[in-house]
Swiss-Prot record:
InterPro entries: Aldolase_TIM, Indole-3-glycerol_P_synth, Indole-3-glycerol_P_synth_dom, Indole-3-GlycerolPSynthase_CS, RibuloseP-bd_barrel. SUPFAM superfamilies: Ribulose-phoshate binding barrel. It catalyses: 1-(2-carboxyphenylamino)-1-deoxy-D-ribulose 5-phosphate + H(+) = (1S,2R)-1-C-(indol-3-yl)glycerol 3-phosphate + CO2 + H2O. This is Indole-3-glycerol phosphate synthase. Belongs to the TrpC family. Keywords: Amino-acid biosynthesis, Aromatic amino acid biosynthesis, Decarboxylase, Lyase, Tryptophan biosynthesis. The keyword Chloroplast does not apply. GO terms for molecular function: indole-3-glycerol-phosphate synthase activity; phosphoribosylanthranilate isomerase activity. Its EC number is 4.1.1.48. The keyword Amino-acid biosynthesis applies. It comes from the Bacteria.
């Protein structure tokens, strides 16, 4: 595990211990079970594909460790509505505070403002966080293979499935892909950003996409800014994308989302229709 992930795990485990003291698992489980059924994250993505559209997982993100503050005018409900109006399939909301200035309350507010299913975007190390996510309404969780051993990844996935949630499994290299394929969830996210160096290149998706079995749903993550980027990844079979920073920096988020997803624009970028 990289130094940054080790640092993140250290503060996350402190957060988890504090959360367990404040609210025992049994209490959080009761809240999670009282929630309505998850909205269906994977189902929403497939619905876009059925209509011949790209599926966008639009990210609500205030800041990041590598870029600092991304959006000063940060209003999660308004941003969620803007993404929905722009054609997003799902939302991803950062809930990590120390590195991303996120919060679970942001996820709750964003989800309440739309009908879109929501991913809790955070570093998950303990099944408690999965139950906590569902208790706050999350429809999907993230499993980052670079941060976890196989047993923990399976435990997180099993917990999510037990609560009816979807799981996005994130990888960055061949070894992580091989481990991810041992899990049950069909969504495989290829992070184009190296969490060890923060170097970002779409070549990562181009290299790994051909190795992902056809029964899995590929998600391109990080380094996606333009319709040409979508077109480039579409050439290796990707039609689902997680995009945050490039849209968060726009004054008109709805218009920027529509422009990114416009098929005609993408067709022009590739020279095809």
């Amino acid at each position: 595990m990289s130094d940054i992930l080790t640092k993140i795990e250290t503060y996350k485990r402190e957060e988890i211990a504090a959360a367990k003291r404040a609210q025992p698992l049994s209490v959080v489980e009761a809240t999670a079970k009282a929630q309505g059924a998850p909205r269906g994250f994977l189902r929403a993505i497939k619905a876009k594909h059925t209509n011949g559209d790209f599926a966008l997982i639009a990210e609500v993100k205030k800041a990041s460790p590598s870029k600092g503050l991304i959006r000063a005018d940060f209003d999660p409900p308004q941003l969620a509505k803007a993404y929905e109006a722009g054609g997003a399939a799902c939302l991803s909301v950062l809930t990590d505070t120390p590195s991303f200035q996120g919060h679970l309350d942001f996820m709750v507010a964003a989800r309440a403002a739309t009908s879109l299913p929501v991913l809790r975007k955070d570093f998950m190390f303990d099944a408690y966080q999965v139950v906590e996510a569902r208790a706050h309404g999350a429809d999907c969780i993230l499993i980052i293979m670079a941060a976890l051993d196989d047993a923990t990844a399976k435990d997180l996935e099993d917990t999510a499935i037990a609560f009816g949630m979807d799981v996005l499994i994130e990888i960055h290299d061949r070894a992580e892909l091989d481990r991810a394929l041992k899990l049950r969830s069909p969504m495989i996210g290829v992070n184009n950003r190296n969490l060890r160096t923060f170097e970002t290149t779409l070549a990562t998706s181009e290299a790994l996409a051909p190795l992902i079995p056809g029964d899995r749903l590929m998600v391109g993550e990080s380094g996606i800014f333009t319709p040409a980027d979508l077109a480039r990844l579409e050439r290796v079979g990707m039609s689902t994308f997680l995009v945050g920073e490039s849209l968060m920096r726009q004054a008109d988020v709805t218009a920027a989302t529509r422009t990114l997803l416009a098929r005609e624009t993408t067709a022009r970028a590739t020279g095809t229709r």
